[in-house]
């Protein structure tokens, strides 16, 4: 099934490449790559899929254009581009994307690290949760960002506490991110103490209980 899926993706990417070459002959200029092609490159990067001989020229062309996405306002686009470049051995270019992503992060003691955009999240790269998780994956895959990833996990947990993860997809994304390498925050339950009128409701973590 995977082979059939990749066969379809390879053919689609090749067809798009041929259309680009045709348009370029007519003077049309292209910047970056389309969203579908970026996803195609990402799947190759994370799966280790071998690029067919017929697609080599197309793949090389697409890869050469990924760096032009550095000016994109979309955080998840930059995150995916960083992974693609890193896996392709273009470490320096990948780190430029990582640096750009980090520049947009905000940090607070309570919330950890997150993107504090005031605009509608759709204007800066899709659903906020998805973009946050995509960036976490990029930082994890490119290495050397353990502390930042852990801080970003904290924001995910705070979202669950304050407003819930807003869809099954968001929930899956969040759980995937929380189970990345590093501290498993899902195991760290902690204690909760709530006072309602004169009544105290309190949970106690297992580490604080004693066996008689």
Question: What are the residue ranges of the model-derived segments?
Answer:
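Large, well-folded core regions of big proteins
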Residues: 1-212
């Amino acid at each position: 099934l995977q082979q059939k899926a990749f066969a379809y993706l390879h053919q689609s990417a090749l067809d798009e490449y041929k259309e680009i070459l045709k348009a370029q002959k007519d003077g049309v200029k292209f910047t970056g790559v389309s969203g579908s092609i970026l996803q195609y490159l990402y799947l190759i990067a994370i799966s280790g899929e071998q690029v067919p001989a017929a697609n080599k020229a197309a793949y090389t062309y697409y890869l050469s254009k990924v760096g032009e996405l550095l000016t994109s306002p979309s955080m998840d686009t930059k995150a995916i581009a960083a992974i693609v470049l890193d896996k392709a051995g273009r470490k320096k270019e990948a780190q430029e994307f990582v640096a750009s992503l980090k520049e947009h992060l905000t940090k607070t003691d309570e919330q950890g690290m997150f993107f504090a955009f005031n605009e509608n999240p759709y204007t800066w790269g899709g659903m906020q949760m998805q973009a946050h998780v995509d960036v976490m994956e990029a930082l994890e895959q490119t290495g050397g960002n353990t502390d930042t990833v852990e801080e970003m996990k904290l924001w995910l947990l705070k979202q669950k506490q304050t407003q819930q993860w807003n869809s099954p997809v968001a929930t899956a994304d969040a759980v995937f991110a929380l189970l990345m390498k590093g501290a498993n925050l899902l195991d760290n339950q902690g204690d909760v103490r709530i006072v309602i009128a004169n009544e105290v409701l309190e949970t106690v973590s297992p580490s604080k209980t004693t066996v008689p």
